[in-house]
Amino acid sequence: MGLKLLESRLCLLLSLGLVLMLASCQPPTPSQWFEIQHIYNRAYPRCNDAMRHRNRFTGHCKDINTFLHTSFASVVGVCGNRNIPCGNRTYRNCHNSRYRVSITFCNLTTPARIYTQCRYQTTRSRKFYTVGCDPRTPRDSPMYPVVPVHLDRIF
């Protein structure tokens, strides 16, 4: 009896581990990818570090990237502002921020085949921004019905 109970618990733990492993292998949702790409993370204060973290998801060096020094929740709030056409004029799901935020702009200066070896120039500024927003996916937090998925421009 004790052995069967141990075997069933072990089987349950292995099954749970497999489910968690498969869930973590899923690519990020569009809004999770937006957060990875564009929300400033204090753990990576310099462009070289921030872009190394960002580039590990794609395995290559992105030429340019803008990080907004604000929270994901604040950008979600911008999604509630008036709709405007996006830069490509195909979509009308864009929204302008009402306030300037600090930004970090990263520009690739030293490309490399191995993404961890790329080097970036850092430029800081304060700018308004425009984001594209879409309804959340089932894997996004139910806290926000509409989420940012695209940084359209800074101005």
From Swiss-Prot:
Residues annotated as signal peptide: 1-25
EC assignment: 3.1.27.-
Glycosylation site list: 88, 107
Record-linked SUPFAM superfamilies: RNase A-like
Record: residues binding substrate: 62-66
Keyword DNA-binding: no
Keywords for the protein's UniProt record, in alphabetical order: Disulfide bond, Endonuclease, Glycoprotein, Hydrolase, Nuclease, Signal
Cysteine pairings via disulfide bonds: 47-106, 61-118, 79-133, 86-94
GO BP term (any one): innate immune response
Residue numbers annotated as active site: 38, 150
Cellular compartment(s): Cytoplasmic granule
Ligase in keyword set: no
Lineage top rank: taxon: Eukaryota
InterPro entries for the chain: RNaseA (IPR001427), RNaseA-like_dom_sf (IPR036816), RNaseA_AS (IPR023411), RNaseA_domain (IPR023412)
Stored SMART domains: RNAse_Pc (SM00092)
A single GO molecular function term of this UniProt record: RNA nuclease activity
GO cellular component: cytoplasm; extracellular space
Function: Cytotoxin and helminthotoxin with ribonuclease activity. Possesses a wide variety of biological activities.
Family: Belongs to the pancreatic ribonuclease family.
Protein name: Eosinophil cationic protein
